[in-house]
Amino acid sequence: MNKQQNNLQDIFLNSARKNKMPVTIYLSTGFQINGTVKGFDSFTVILDSEGKQMLIYKHAITTVTPEKPILFVDNES
């Protein structure tokens, strides 16, 4: 019962982070940010963009597009 179940969002972001895959994050303002995911939690994503670290609130994100497709295989379970 203590086992935490991963959701698609966590699997997606964790795979992008582990593989250091470049992503484009689209914000609700229409702004685009390119970079690599360094970490995330329930409310935020840490992105490295051109050598600068950004803390982006998930409620401001509309879309995350990876450079290559991400496979939805949860190898940690």
From Swiss-Prot:
Entry keywords, A to Z: RNA-binding, Stress response
Positions of transmembrane segments: none
Record-level Gene Ontology MF annotations: RNA binding
Biological process, per Gene Ontology: regulation of DNA-templated transcription; regulation of RNA stability; regulation of translation, ncRNA-mediated
GO CC field: cytosol
Domain Sm, residue spans: 10-70
Listed Pfam families: Hfq
UniProt family annotation: Belongs to the Hfq family.
Role noted for this protein: RNA chaperone that binds small regulatory RNA (sRNAs) and mRNAs to facilitate mRNA translational regulation in response to envelope stress, environmental stress and changes in metabolite concentrations. Also binds with high specificity to tRNAs.
Stated name of the protein: RNA-binding protein Hfq
Source organism per UniProt: Clostridium botulinum (strain Eklund 17B / Type B)
